[in-house]
Amino acid sequence: MTAIDFHGVFPAMCTPFHQDGSIDFETLRDDAQRLESAGVDGLVPVGSTGESATLSHDEHIEVVEAVIDAVDDVPVIAGSGSNNTKEALELSRRSAEAGADALLLISPYYNKPEQQGFIDHYTTLADAVDLPQIVYNVPSRTGQNIEPDTAAELASHPNIRAYKAASGDMNQISEIIERTRDEDFAVLSGDDGMTLPMLSVGGTGCISVSANIEPERTCAMVGAALSGDFERAQAIHHELGPLFRAMFVETNPIPVKEAMRIRGYGPAHLRSPLTRLSDEHLDHLRDVLATLETEDLEDEYAEAER
């Protein structure tokens, strides 16, 4: 199994599209290189932020391959989850063959399995594909919560190495961290506004939407917290707070794609049924981004000990 350190910042990448809906691979590669140059610890293509639900299986793997080809040393964690275990297994195997360093596996959605169903699903994938795997719990999207007992049982599998927490429940997240501390197991934030609170109780980093827009600041915040400088981490957290909130005023990735367009990082085109950011939120997003641009702190953040 490939070794990977699940500490730090892992941007959940967007999949850029041309106006006709085809994938803009040139922009995708440029974006991967921009984020790697900013100092992130890994890249996560074809997850929820990457609109994986609208990609064919072949497109899914083509995006993974393009990101891998674009970067030098940064690990690539491919989203390969599904609500169909057989389909998740196919995507996971193909992602591994494409050269992915690890897999991000959203819990089965819509069909709402019971806890034993989660255990069976993830164990099947972990037994079959010899890559580090991240269990992803986001009940607001999937309709079902992965409970702490289930997370703790899954953490004992040698290929299940991390848990992405986006439940919004700090008591639950804290319990999972407590119960897996003796395992070689990482707990990552999947909610930018919860990243610093999670780091304060033993979380190891984040799979972040906002890091697409502010990678240096996000790396500085996480790096400061991991090194014990919570005063600095807190200051950056509050500096980024308006961005964290702006990224979720509408369904992800609608706001982040608009922010990418405003910053000149790529187009805001989305695949149906997602639609462009509404005018009522667009002006506020511009204001948030303009405020962040008033201070040129990139060099300071890039030099922060991480």
Swiss-Prot record:
CDD domains found in the cross-reference section: DHDPS
Enzyme class of the recorded protein, top EC level: lyase
Catalytic activity, reaction form: L-aspartate 4-semialdehyde + pyruvate = (2S,4S)-4-hydroxy-2,3,4,5-tetrahydrodipicolinate + H2O + H(+)
Subcellular location: Cytoplasm
GO BP: diaminopimelate biosynthetic process; lysine biosynthetic process via diaminopimelate
Site (Part of a proton relay during catalysis): 48, 110
InterPro entries, per database record: Aldolase_TIM (IPR013785), DapA (IPR005263), DapA-like (IPR002220), Schiff_base-form_aldolases_CS (IPR020624)
Gene3D superfamilies: Aldolase class I (3.20.20.70)
Source domain of life: Archaea
Example of a GO MF term: 4-hydroxy-tetrahydrodipicolinate synthase activity
GO CC term, one of those recorded: cytoplasm
EC number: 4.3.3.7
Signal peptide per UniProt: none
Active-site residues from the entry: 136 (proton donor/acceptor), 164 (schiff-base intermediate with substrate)
Positions annotated to bind pyruvate: 49, 207
Keywords: Amino-acid biosynthesis, Cytoplasm, Diaminopimelate biosynthesis, Lyase, Lysine biosynthesis, Schiff base
The protein's annotated pathway: Amino-acid biosynthesis; L-lysine biosynthesis via DAP pathway; (S)-tetrahydrodipicolinate from L-aspartate: step 3/4
Described purpose of this protein according to its UniProt entry: Catalyzes the condensation of (S)-aspartate-beta-semialdehyde [(S)-ASA] and pyruvate to 4-hydroxy-tetrahydrodipicolinate (HTPA).
NCBIfam families documented for this protein: dapA (TIGR00674)
Oligomer and partners: Homotetramer; dimer of dimers.
Family membership noted in the UniProt record: Belongs to the DapA family.
Protein name, entry field: 4-hydroxy-tetrahydrodipicolinate synthase
Organism from which the protein derives: Haloarcula marismortui (strain ATCC 43049 / DSM 3752 / JCM 8966 / VKM B-1809) (Halobacterium marismortui)
